[in-house]
Amino acid sequence: MEPWECAIAYHNQTKHHFRGYARSLGYLDWATQPDPFRRFDGAPFLPLPRTDEDSSPPYSDIYALDRVAPKPVCLRTISEFFYLSLAISAWKEYEGTRWALRCNPSSGNLHPTEGYLVIGPVDGLSDTPSIYHYAPKEHALELRTSFSIEVWKQLVNGLPPRSLFVGLSSITWREAWKYGERAYRYCQQDMGHALAACSISGATLGWRVHLINPMSDVDVAKLLGLDRREQFHEREMEDSEALLAVIPSLCERPPTLTPSAAAIEQIAAGEWHGQANRLSSSHVHWQLIDAVAESCVKPATEIDNLGSYPVGGGIRSVAPTTSASARQIIRQRRSAVALDGTTAISRDQFYDLLSRLMPGSNNVPWNTIGPPAKVHLGLFVHRVTGLEPGLYGLVRSPEQEEPLRNAMRPGFAWQRPPGCPTSLPLYLLSTGDCTTLAARVSCLQDIAGDGAFSLGMIAEFIKPLQRYGAWFYRRLFWEAGAIGQVLYLEAEAAGIRSTGIGCYFDDPVHDAFGLRGPQYQSMYHFTMGGPVEDSRLTTLPAYGADRAQRGIDPP
């Protein structure tokens, strides 16, 4: 079996069906719940400065690259970058139990994603280039290793001055503890959340964030110290996911950088600090996850093998929906637990937030995720004033419109809805009340039918895996997760609330849109509307004097 065929087999085996769910333990073993906070015991610890001063730009300015002037790289701006991407945003408390919320959403609030900083000398941080692990509970950095300025120059050769790197990894066990074999999907979905969170956080500082596509997973792991097996428990290893180049300047084109292999080898040969903390006392081993993870390891690839966005692709001018700052919207993001079934949004609001999802080389976060766009939206519209309820489709790449039309139900209307901007490829497929259908295909969850709308993210599936390789399976989830992160923030800006839905019946979703065969697959669901708040919960600040006593995230 080819690696891409293994990825497809995994996807098929981990589908939820009306007749039964993907394989998991079947219950929650609370005694082995993973610690959501990785620490490297013995590593030098550097708290990052925090400030209540909000100097971020208006939220509406962060989606275009030319609207925010770059801020200098310093200890304060490094802190702000993490504070608006991977940090804790609040704590919740109920009957003495406390759990953390973060700026980057996570399936089940289990947070498999870890972050790393690779940076040159910075006043107040270090006189030498270093690699750090980000500790969100303390909003601090843990020094993993340092290296010479000569090696640093080799590593960043080709990047503008003061550039830095951010690395991301996944601890699959955190998701597998609850979700079993389907956990690999959720780790990749959360990686998409995190990539978009980093891109958007960088945009608040005027920094451009680029995914370094050519790098292999092996090289990313070596650079971040993730291949040092003696420093991790064997069931709690971190899978390398991505290395981001963060550029604090208005460079016109993304870098075509592949960090020097010789520099990475020299860094790996240095002295590394810290031992990864144990997250659980025991583990359940899922061989299917091991198999798909091995198949989807990314090799080194050609710089331009993913192509480019279509010429002219870009977001239309969207009127500001809020006067709030970017920092306020990012840090108030929450996942809805229930929706009221009555709140509607206007047609123009609907068009504006969908416009944020259109890819383009100058649009955040799509400049980070990069081409090609392979994920489209199948929408269940319930309560949008000025639009008929029914099924709609958003085609996010023009070359996919004809294949999607041919793949979906022949009787669909494919009509342009009234007042829809010409730049937004949105189509009415069929009219009618679809609240029950939306809830039914989303694992019978009422929240999918109680919002203004819900959606399934439908990816072109077989051809990209055949063309690029099994590793592109992960990229489909990254793109879907990034869409989710933008929708989360757009809901907050519109004064409503949203949530991602990872539990859905895969093939019934395809049936709802008339999709037959494996060419298109649903990757992630989402809903937004008027929230029903749980008055039993107390909200506590993210960081304060009693933070060391706070608990861990429940599922």
Predicted regions and their residues:
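N-terminal accessory segments that position/regulate proteins before the catalytic core
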Residues: 1-486, 494-555
